[in-house]
Amino acid sequence: MRMPALLIAALLPLLALAADETPLPATVDSLQIIELTEGTGTEARPGNTVVVHYTGWLYDPQAEEGKGKKFDSSVDRGSPFDFPLGAGRVIRGWDAGVAGMKAGGKRRLIIPPDMGYGQRGAGRVIPPGATLLVDVELLDVR
């Protein structure tokens, strides 16, 4: 009788961890920001030029971590991307999702269509109405 009780006691923490995993939403109607690594450097604010590494996927709630088809990656090219934060030079999801990050930080952004490429999409790479998932690492703030 003692052995089953010990086995159950050992399995309870594992069951709690499994139950704690929140499923990804099927649709996203607002920007989702997931802090992966808190940076310790300068905070990015509108007006700064930010230097980032990123990888972008089409959001797919059925795929592992929501990562559907990869559409672009500065990491794969080995070439960081810089842009003036808040100047409208990138999609709104990027401006809003990078603001407040600190250099050295990493975030996962789940960007709804209205903060991405909307109903027009982007060429043959991003279809109309696509939700995007982008991992961003803030390398520098100038």
Region locations from a protein language model:
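Cross-family detector of peptidyl-prolyl cis-trans isomerase
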Residues: 2-142
